[in-house]
A protein has these predicted regions:
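Enzyme catalytic cores with a strong preference for nitrogen-chemistry domains
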Residues: 1-348, 366-375, 407
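ATP/NTP-dependent adenylation/nucleotidyl-transfer catalytic domains that generate, transfer
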Residues: 161, 219-220, 229-232, 246, ...
């Protein structure tokens, strides 16, 4: 359970209705197999020891006694296994029959959780046999041991402080106020649901929606185990629709109509991180809950779950198109409001033939179109200098012309050389002064053009550059409204591609496609043989790595060691551990050192769950030490 990862399973085994010996044998085998696969928690369906469809046989004492004996056997089977199992059975307490879930671990029955909501409608008639349980925890004696009995039980372990298990049963989830709500507010990070949900047309879709929604609302892992083949088909069919969800995402799901065991790793640190960030998620006092300790080992869980190497970019084409349109709409509406509020006559955008300025101009055009303002009031300024190549220059010119905006060219070589003379800088020394002088000269021109035309300078810098501080302070770092400030570099490429695919303008399409094929570069150093010599990703590292690091740092507050571990999984076969670690060190060093630039960012719209605005999502002192992060990085 290192880094908060715990491997969990949802299993449906073959059963025979009312044959507790057969069912118990299959349950124990599934538990043993799961333990061999380093699974720490396995959940079985509702009433799996007897079968859900026993009907009036539930009123037979021999069946109830046999189920209790089977539970003792199942618990005994876990004695030498590092696993916790949750199984379903009918249980009599104080002369009343309950539909229960039993949690077994280390050879013991750790707790019995009764079903609170007993359905008695349509095909369900559980009230005929079962009584609704209570939240209050009492104790029952099973095989000489006092076992907690009630809904309000939290199962915890010293092996992982974030592991807190609670249980609800089938219909409990379908109600307006599922027990899992209170469980989660009491601290539960994992909800186990033992279910017997029969199949009717499209019910699987609703079932999935419930599981996803509950895991999202509660910031929890949700393990749903469904009855399957072997249940009586007298009137109903059960398909074993097992699911494991985490914060609104289905991580694993079985193929329906096949009894299967599905497993994956839940990231409990991630869930707790989400809860800590949300001040409206209030963990209430747990005085009404009983905590039960489970015997579990920490271990080093191998990550088998999918880790997205581009977490900012939807992998599905249709979702990506929808997301692209949504982001462009957010950006353009933000700019539209600012233009409208300031009564700006123009918008000034510096165009370089690169991705960022391309997106900024596309957004500006959208804003002007929505305001019904002539595109000629958009002034695209190209400012060639020492590092400008013919390719980027021509793309900038063709791009602006194809959009129908006003194009202005200001060659800044003479101005920068004069500046070098004024400050006594040798123009043959290609240092930070050489580079930043060009960036600041460009910003000065844009600001002055905006003043002259009564307009606003539209910022082009993206979120990835801001995270790394890859911007000249008071140069391209500054603008009057930064439309790209909330968009990471890996996503910008897809936004530009989206616009390229949807345009009917052949020149614009061709130009955008060539811009997409151009290496990312600030073009501040002279080209070699007419080609770009200064490639950003050769200097600061691959943006796909940095965006991955940024996402996990900002979204979940993950430690460097965990981010490295996740990156190794996500980028397997692309980057080896040493390369990832090298750029991870660069990322942390730059992220901390460059906060002073982020502390004085221009306004700009937030577009995603990760943002760096000092007025909103990220308030970090500019002089914070990164010593403890660096210390951990050196141990990796």
């Amino acid at each position: 359970m290192k880094d908060g990862f715990v491997r969990c399973a949802s299993a449906t085994v073959d059963i025979k209705v009312a044959d507790t010996d057969y069912n118990t044998s299959n349950i124990i085998k599934a538990i043993e197999d799961a333990a061999q696969n380093n699974i720490k928690l396995i959940v079985f369906p509702e009433l799996c020891i007897t079968g859900y469809t026993c009907g009036d046989l539930f009123l037979q004492k021999i069946l109830i006694d046999s189920a209790k004996d089977s539970l003792i056997k199942i618990a005994k089977a876990t004695e030498n296994l590092d696993i916790t199992a949750v199984v379903g059975l009918p249980y009599v307490a104080e002369q009343t029959l309950y539909n229960c879930a039993a949690v077994v671990n280390g050879g013991h029955i750790k707790g019995l959780v009764p079903k609170l909501n007993i359905p008695n409608y349509a095909e369900f008639y559980e009230v005929r046999h079962f009584t609704a349980g209570k939240n209050e925890v009492t104790y029952v004696n099973i095989n000489g041991e006092e076992v907690p009995f009630g809904a309000n039980i939290l199962f915890k372990t010293d092996a992982c402080e974030d592991f807190v298990l609670a249980v609800e049963i089938c219909e409990d989830l379908w109600t307006a106020m599922p027990p899992s709500v209170n469980h989660a507010l009491a601290g539960a990070t994992i909800i186990a649901n033992l279910s017997a949900s029969n199949e009717v047309i499209a019910k699987d879709e609703y079932r999935e929606m419930l599981v996803k929604s509950q895991s999202a609302k509660l910031y929890c892992g949700y393990i749903y185990s469904d009855a399957g083949y072997g249940e009586s088909t007298t009137d109903l069919v059960f398909a074993g629709d097992n699911m494991i969800a985490e914060n609104g995402t289905i991580l694993a799901r079985s193929k329906r109509f096949n009894n299967e065991c599905v497993y994956t790793e839940l990231d409990l640190e991630r869930l707790v991180g989400e809860r800590k960030k949300s001040n409206t998620y209030n963990i209430v006092g747990s005085e009404k809950y009983v905590s039960v300790k489970l015997d579990m080992n920490i271990g080093d869980t191998k990550i088998t779950r999918y880790v997205d190497k581009q977490p900012f970019v939807p992998s599905d084409d249709k979702k990506r198109e929808k997301r692209s349109e949504e982001i462009l709409s957010i950006q353009s509406l933000g700019l539209k409001k600012r233009l409208d509020h300031t009564h700006a006559k123009t918008a000034v955008v510096g165009v370089s033939g690169g991705l960022d300025s391309t997106l900024a101009l596309l957004v500006t055009v959208r804003a002007f179109d929505s305001l019904n303002i002539d595109r000629k009031n958009i002034i695209a300024v190209t400012m060639p200098c020492f590092g400008t190549t013919d390719r980027t220059y021509n793309n900038a010119v063709n791009f602006a012309n194809s959009l129908g905006v006003t194009l202005k060219e200001v060659n800044i070589k003479a101005a920068v050389n004069q500046h070098f003379a004024d400050i006594e800088h040798d123009p043959n020394v290609y240092d930070v002064t050489y580079e930043n002088s060009q960036a600041r000269e460009r910003t000065q021109i844009l600001m002055d053009v905006a003043n002259k035309s009564g307009g606003l300078v539209i910022g082009t810098g993206d979120m990835s550059e801001l995270a790394l501080g890859w911007a000249t302070y008071n140069g391209d770092h500054m603008s009057m409204y930064g439309v790209n400030a909330g968009v990471p570099k890996t996503l910008i490429r897809y936004l530009v591609d989206y616009e390229a695919k949807r345009t009917n303008n052949d020149i614009l399409k061709k130009t955008l496609q060539d811009i997409l094929d151009t290496p990312v570069s600030p073009e501040l150093l002279p080209p070699k043989d007419g080609k770009i010599s200064q490639k950003t990703e050769h200097i600061v590292g691959p943006y796909e790595l940095h965006d991955f690091f940024l996402y996990h740092l900002m979204r979940f507050g993950s430690k460097p060691s965990k981010i490295l571990r996740l990156a190794e999984v996500a980028f397997e076969g692309i980057y080896d551990r040493e390369v990832i670690l090298e750029w991870l060190k660069v990322f942390y060093r730059r992220f901390f050192a460059q906060q002073f630039k982020r502390s004085c960012l221009p306004d700009g719209p937030k577009v995603g769950s990760v943002a760096l605005s000092p007025r909103g999502d990220w308030r970090m002192p500019s002089d914070a030490s990164y010593q403890i992060w660096a210390k951990e990085l050196e141990t990796l």
